[in-house]
């Protein structure tokens, strides 16, 4: 019955903030906001580690640090949040960020994003959480062209397997997807596949926890 919302707080200098919510029946209550980045913060995306109670990661664009792609570990206790140190996953202009933990490997997650400092390619990196610190492996390109609205999800039935869905700007704005496989901190990708031969916006992906290798992509068909 606990969840976290991460956001840009425009009433607090655009700082990145997060808050714990508690569900009781059909009612919600919230704790106090806790700032995770005391500078202009865009595209915050939060994901919990399903293997570690109360542990989550926020990935975001840190405008106050040259728009680098950055992530931080948070730990929930009651309705309070404590954070570790920030870790950079892309020393370049990053946006359209999504992240997901591997349900089969504690402390392991993937972050996907558009790397504006590398021709706006769709890019991914593996993060490893140890305590309240994050280390990242190398960056891996899954689409050597402009990739918007990137979203990733792991298959909970297959360790290390995930899907990325995105808008392929150089392919008429079509919706494309690709399978990634994690081994340690390296990622290998399969071929890309079109799931919508039309203008595609805001794709999201979810895997069926009861059926291996099955997932659904929802999107705006514009």
Which residue stretches match the model-derived regions?
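Extracellular, repeat-based ectodomains that mediate carbohydrate processing or recognition
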Residues: 1-222
């Amino acid at each position: 019955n606990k969840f976290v919302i991460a956001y840009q707080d425009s009433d607090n200098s655009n700082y990145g903030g997060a808050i714990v919510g508690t569900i009781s029946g059909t009612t919600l209550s919230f704790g106090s906001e806790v700032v995770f980045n005391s500078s202009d913060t865009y595209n915050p995306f939060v994901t919990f580690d399903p293997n570690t109670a109360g542990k989550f990661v926020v990935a975001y664009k840190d405008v106050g640090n040259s728009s680098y792609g950055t992530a931080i570990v948070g730990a929930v206790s009651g309705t309070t949040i404590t954070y570790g140190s920030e870790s950079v996953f892309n020393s370049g202009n990053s946006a359209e960020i999504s992240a997901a933990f591997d349900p089969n490997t504690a402390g392991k997650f993937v972050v996907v994003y558009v790397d504006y400092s590398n021709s706006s390619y769709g890019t991914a990196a593996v993060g490893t959480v140890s305590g309240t610190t994050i280390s990242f492996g190398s960056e891996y390109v899954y689409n050597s062209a402009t990739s918007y609205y990137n979203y990733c999800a792991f298959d909970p039935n297959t360790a290390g397997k995930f899907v990325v869905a995105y808008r392929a700007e150089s392919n008429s704005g079509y919706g494309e997807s690709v399978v990634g496989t994690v081994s340690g901190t390296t990622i290998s990708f399969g071929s890309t596949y079109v799931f919508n031969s039309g203008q595609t916006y805001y794709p999201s992906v979810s895997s069926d926890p009861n059926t291996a290798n099955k997932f659904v992509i929802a999107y705006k068909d514009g």
